[in-house]
Amino acid sequence: MDGQPITGGVHPTENLNAEHHDFIKAALNETGTHAGRKYKVLRSSQQVVAGMKYTFYIVFEDDESGQEYKITAWSRPWLQDKGEALKLTFDKHEPK
């Protein structure tokens, strides 16, 4: 994927960078209860949607249950309103 344009559907994110981890940490900080916890990214994807939508599936390193969580980050950096420029969600993920 690196260097090639991304179009249309959902594509795996092959190499997580600092910006991706910043999105994850920001989502964890918004929860209040998970701020600062160490996590492991199980898989991630990205999609062009009037900006970029990133989806990360994580587990917490200190959680023996293996519960997965889904974080989404919708980045539209050209918007002036910071609340609209980055939308974050954090949810429990129940694999099907």
From Swiss-Prot:
Tissue: Salivary gland. Midgut.
Glycan-carrying positions: 29
A Gene Ontology molecular function term of the record: cysteine-type endopeptidase inhibitor activity
Induction description: Up-regulated following apoptosis induction by staurosporine.
Pfam families linked to this entry: Cystatin (PF00031)
Top-level division of the source organism's lineage: Eukaryota
Disruption phenotype: (Microbial infection) RNAi-mediated knockdown results in increased titers of dengue virus type 2 in salivary glands but not in carcasses.
Range of residues in the leader sequence: none
InterPro entries xrefs: Cystatin_dom, Cystatin_sf
Keywords: Glycoprotein, Protease inhibitor, Thiol protease inhibitor
Ranges where the Cystatin domain occurs: 22-65
Biological role stated in the UniProt entry: Cysteine proteinase inhibitor. Inhibits cathepsin L-like peptidase. Increases cell viability following apoptosis induction by staurosporine. Inhibits human cathepsin S (CTSS), human cathepsin L2 (CTSV), human cathepsin L (CTSL), human cathepsin B (CTSB) and papain. (Microbial infection) Modulates dengue virus type 2 replication in salivary glands.
Note: Negative correlation between cystatin transcription and titers of dengue virus type 2 is observed in infected mosquitoes.
Family statement drawn from the similarity comment of this UniProt entry: Belongs to the cystatin family.
Subunit comment: Interacts with cathepsin L-like peptidase; the interaction results in inhibition of cathepsin L-like peptidase activity.
Official protein name in the record: Cystatin
Lineage, top ranks: Eukaryota, Metazoa, Ecdysozoa, Arthropoda, Hexapoda
